Amino acid sequence: MKKIFFTLLTVMFCVSAFSQTVETIRKDYADALAHAKQINDPEYPVNNKFKVVTEQMMPGSGPHQVTANFYYYEDENEESPSDITKSIYYVTHSYNWAAREYYEEYLYTRKGKIEFIYQRGYDDDFQLYEYRFYFDAKGVIKVIVKRKKDDDSALTQEYSGATVTDKYKKAYDAAVKHSEYFKGLFDTLNSFSY
């Protein structure tokens, strides 16, 4: 009986720890959105954001625009206040291919590790999708996939779980690669700033 009790207690603790982590990430995400909104306000005096916009004409599909916003914190060195370290915490990335709009968000920890990825776009079959990947220090801890079937007006949940299944592995790998790309691009932009 004690063995069953301790097993149940352990399972409940693990579930509780998992939900706390996802809830913590959601809180960090809400904080990042609020901070980004504040920074985007023209009245706000501190604009801790790099913005990159590229525009080009694509043969066969027309105008193409890519916009990436890199939001960061500034941390002063206590020994040398003029020595400021910039820490990326949030990236938005939007682009279009012909008439299709794509949107992505990347949330990073203070140490620059990926914490959350959100992607909304169209798959190879032109179905609208949403991916949400939650991370802890060891890797992915929760995956949520929503998809619009045919001409339904709302996205419906297709998958929710703690692992990346084979069906979503390609999308997951691409999302993680993009998060690393944007972190590297931020580091490059940061090297050009003061």
Label for each model-derived stretch:
Residues 3-15:
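Sec-dependent N-terminal signal peptides
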Residues 20-69, 73-76, 126-194:
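Long terminal segments
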Residues 83-92, 112-118:
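Short, hydrophobic/aromatic-rich segments at coil-to-beta transitions
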Residues 90-94, 103-104:
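Functional cores of ribonucleases/endoribonucleases
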Residues 92-96, 118-122, 145-148:
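Beta-turn initiation residues at beta-strand->coil junctions
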Residues 99-104, 117, 126-131:
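Short, surface-exposed coil-to-beta transition loops
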Residues 103-111:
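Extracellular/lumenal glycan-associated surfaces
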